[in-house]
Structures are given as structure tokens and as C-alpha cells.
Amino acid sequence: MTRIAGVNVPVKKCIPFGLTYIYGIGISTANIICHACGIDKSKRVSELRDKDIEKINSFIRQNYSIEGDLRKEVAMNIKSLVEMGCYRGVRHRKGLPVRGQRTHTNAKTRKGKSRLPIAGKE
């Protein structure tokens, strides 16, 4: 396992697919990183030299928020929506879909089990 941006990346994967193991980097962002660093996309992670790994690390650090910072940022954004009391915040608080999806027949996973009390049981 090669360590890039504090994440263990599998050595047998192609570089763009290996970079997607980092939270906040998808396949299109990984392709942009490879192009910006001048690294061939068809190479495997195991074929990277230390110089290439350092180049990727510095590019990611300068241009993207990833891992813990990104998770904190997303959590703070959701928290501010909930505190504002806007529609999206209310949906987050109730555990319902936020982006306008249908809930009458779908969204079973998001809604969870119904918590209605059963008559005669306490």
C-alpha cells in the first residue's frame, strides 16, 4: 500500500482509480490530478516514484479539501441548515430525503423503521 494524502492506496490499481480511495476525490478529479502532475493515467500506483507521489500530495494539498477537513465542512454545512430552520434543515432533522425525492412509496432506507407504538404494549 502506498500512502497518498494520508490514505493507503492499493498498489495494483491504476492511478486514477487508486486516488478515488481518498475521500473527496472522484474519478474526474483524479484524472485532473494526473493531468496536472504530468503522470500517465495507465500507470499503476506501484510504478509511481517518490517524486511523483510528492507531486500528487502537494497538488492535492494546495487545490482540494479532502478527508477530515471535508467531512467537517460537510457536517458544519448540514448543522447550519438545521440551525437556520430552512426546509433542507428540517428534512435533515426529520431524517427524510432532502432533494425533493418522492417519499410516499420510496425512501424506505432514509426514513428508517416506523416508530409507532403498538396498541396494548408499553
Swiss-Prot record:
Residues 97-122 are annotated as: Disordered. Keywords: Ribonucleoprotein, Ribosomal protein, RNA-binding, rRNA-binding, tRNA-binding. Disulfide bonds: none annotated. PROSITE patterns: RIBOSOMAL_S13_1, RIBOSOMAL_S13_2. It holds the Pfam family Ribosomal_S13. GO terms for cellular component: cytosol; small ribosomal subunit. PANTHER family: 30S RIBOSOMAL PROTEIN S13/40S RIBOSOMAL PROTEIN S18, SMALL RIBOSOMAL SUBUNIT PROTEIN US13M. Located at the top of the head of the 30S subunit, it contacts several helices of the 16S rRNA. In the 70S ribosome it contacts the 23S rRNA (bridge B1a) and protein L5 of the 50S subunit (bridge B1b), connecting the 2 subunits; these bridges are implicated in subunit movement. Contacts the tRNAs in the A and P-sites. This is Small ribosomal subunit protein uS13. The gene is rpsM.
